[in-house]
């Protein structure tokens, strides 16, 4: 009886202590503008995940720890508020006018977000600069509703294909119009450093794109670069270093050579049972699995006809060591380094402002043979002339070098597809029957293209060798210049004249090795492509 009384006392004491550790807080949240209750406002204990939301009457009830001192109340479009913990609270939330007063860039200049009636979305430069992308088109991925971006290549510096509000035509181009600092841009977006971006604005509907006519039928992406600033000159330097690695792992396929031999033996045996019977098919399949079917025996010290035990269908226990350790699922892929350095300076007086930047990017892909390098520079100057006139200029230069690893189509020269489909028994390099590497007359390691031992899969193909031996390099020099004149008079009347001159010079080299691959039958092939284009634009608003 005493023990029962003691246990009951401990239980009641524990309940009392538990109740003493929390405090119930109730209250209501209403709008300061119209005194209406706010439905779905968030009430959270500061520094924790303990919280609740208001009901249809704007009321809430929350058990908070006795150590809690502050509650954070927030709602979309309202200013967040912090209040002390009390048993009963009445909270007024005010509208956050800053959201509505945000200025956005549109086709005809700039406007307040609250007064804009078209369909447009903006990604700020601060968000873009947090993304580790070499091409600013990749920054739109998942950032804006109604914008779809796809990329058929994982090569650093490759641009994404952009679709705004779906496909508008089955025969014409689907790409949106790119406008940089008020003027259409025909160059590569990978030539623009993400550190020079002030904002990206996507215009989605016909009203927003009307200024550009038919060219804006697929939507418009307006790129605004960082502008000059008044005040004391400020220098900013940023250095980044990191690594690129394969994010999506290979599919679940057989990677163990012994398991692959056993499954192929079973398949080979089953195909012979109807004509030879089970015992005969088992014996024949084990005797001829290598010589008549797979051609390659990866295991050292085990004869081709003794690799599989026909009685059990299992691998010979003596098959414990490999003649080669090449791994198609790993060897073509390696972590690449990514380093980026940017420096800029901005400042000026009330009438004259300037901005200058210099950047370097080296981005090695995780696939052998893929790399992107960029050197960029930009100078921007704005000058007020009197009270009503303002002029400015913007000159940018970029030198880019992009190396790609090969084919992205669904064929044997696609490194991703090949490495996913080839069996784990086939090597990357060429070995003799004893497992020794073979070399050419110049002392270079030879690659296995499947012709030496009649490989049954993808004869004359080795995409890793092709990626290493082929040359696919694109060198570009882009020079973009922008100038404007802006006149303000008659109160709200503004006249703007934009002029631009762009030069795009490309030097592309493509060489396909004669030692194997698609060009082996013609002794290799190569070409150089050196187009140069220039654009002169003049726009007035």
Regions found by a protein language model. Give the residues of each.
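Short, small/polar-rich motifs associated with maturation and membrane association
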Residues: 1-378, 383-398, 412, 464, ...
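Small-side-chain secondary-structure face that scaffolds active or pore-lining regions
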Residues: 314, 365-376, 382-384, 394-409, ...
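Short glycine-enriched loops at secondary-structure junctions
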Residues: 109, 450-452, 502-503
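Short, flexible, mixed-charge acidic loops at enzyme active sites
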Residues: 235, 453-454, 512-516
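Asparagine-centered polar/low-complexity signal
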Residues: 218, 462, 539-541
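A ubiquitous, low-specificity "background" feature that marks scattered single residues
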Residues: 8-9, 37, 61, 187, ...
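Acidic/polar loop-and-plug regions of large Gram-negative outer-membrane beta-barrel proteins
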Residues: 313, 320, 398, 404-478, ...
């Amino acid at each position: 009886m005493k023990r029962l009384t003691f246990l009951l006392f401990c239980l009641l004491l524990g309940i009392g202590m538990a109740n003493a550790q929390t405090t119930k807080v109730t209250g209501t949240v209403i709008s300061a503008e119209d005194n209406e209750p706010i439905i779905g406002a968030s009430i959270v204990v500061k520094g924790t995940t303990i919280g609740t939301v208001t009901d249809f009457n704007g009321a809430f009830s929350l058990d908070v720890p006795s150590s809690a001192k502050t509650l954070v109340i927030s709602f979309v479009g309202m200013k967040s508020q912090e209040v002390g913990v009390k048993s009963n609270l009445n909270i007024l939330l005010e509208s956050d006018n800053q959201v509505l007063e945000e200025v956005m860039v549109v086709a005809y200049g700039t406007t307040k977000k609250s007064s804009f009636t078209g369909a447009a979305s903006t990604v700020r430069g601060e968000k873009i600069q947090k993304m580790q992308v070499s091409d600013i088109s990749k920054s739109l991925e998942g950032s804006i509703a109604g914008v779809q971006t796809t990329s058929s290549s994982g090569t650093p510096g490759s641009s994404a294909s952009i679709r705004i509000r779906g496909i508008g035509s089955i025969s014409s181009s689907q790409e949106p119009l790119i406008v940089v600092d008020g003027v259409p841009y025909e160059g590569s977006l990978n030539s623009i450093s993400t550190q020079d971006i002030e904002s990206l604005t996507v215009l989605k509907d016909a009203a927003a794109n009307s200024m550009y006519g038919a060219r804006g039928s697929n939507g418009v992406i307006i790129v605004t670069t960082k502008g000059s600033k008044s005040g004391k000159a400020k220098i900013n330097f940023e250095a980044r270093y990191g690594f690129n690695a394969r994010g999506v792992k290979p599919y679940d396929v057989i990677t163990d050579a012994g398991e692959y031999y056993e499954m192929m033996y079973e398949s080979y045996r089953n195909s012979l049972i109807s004509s030879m019977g089970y015992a005969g098919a088992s014996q024949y399949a084990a005797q001829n699995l290598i010589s008549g079917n797979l051609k390659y025996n990866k295991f050292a010290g085990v004869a081709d006809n003794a690799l599989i035990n026909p009685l059990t269908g299992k691998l010979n226990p003596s098959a414990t060591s490999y003649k080669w350790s090449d791994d198609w699922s790993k060897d073509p892929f390696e972590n690449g380094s990514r380093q980026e350095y940017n420096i800029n300076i901005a400042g000026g007086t009330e009438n004259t402002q300037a901005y200058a930047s210099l950047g370097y990017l080296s981005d090695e892909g995780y696939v052998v043979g893929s790399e992107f390098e960029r050197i960029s520079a930009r100078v921007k100057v704005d000058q007020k002339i009197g009270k009503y006139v303002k002029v400015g200029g913007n000159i940018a230069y970029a030198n880019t070098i992009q190396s790609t690893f090969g084919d992205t189509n669904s064929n044997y020269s696609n490194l991703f597809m090949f490495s996913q489909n080839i069996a784990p028994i086939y090597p990357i390099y060429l070995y003799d029957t004893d497992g020794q590497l073979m070399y050419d007359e110049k002392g270079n390691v030879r690659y296995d293209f499947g012709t030496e031992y009649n490989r049954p899969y993808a004869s004359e193909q080795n995409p890793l060798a092709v990626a290493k031996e082929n040359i696919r390099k694109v060198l570009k020099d882009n020079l973009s210049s922008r100038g404007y004149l802006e006149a303000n008079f008659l109160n709200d009347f503004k006249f703007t004249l934009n002029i631009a001159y762009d030069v795009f010079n490309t030097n592309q080299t493509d060489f396909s090795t004669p030692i194997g691959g698609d060009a082996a039958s013609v002794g290799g092939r190569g070409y150089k492509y050196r187009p140069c284009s220039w654009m002169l634009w003049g726009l007035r608003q």
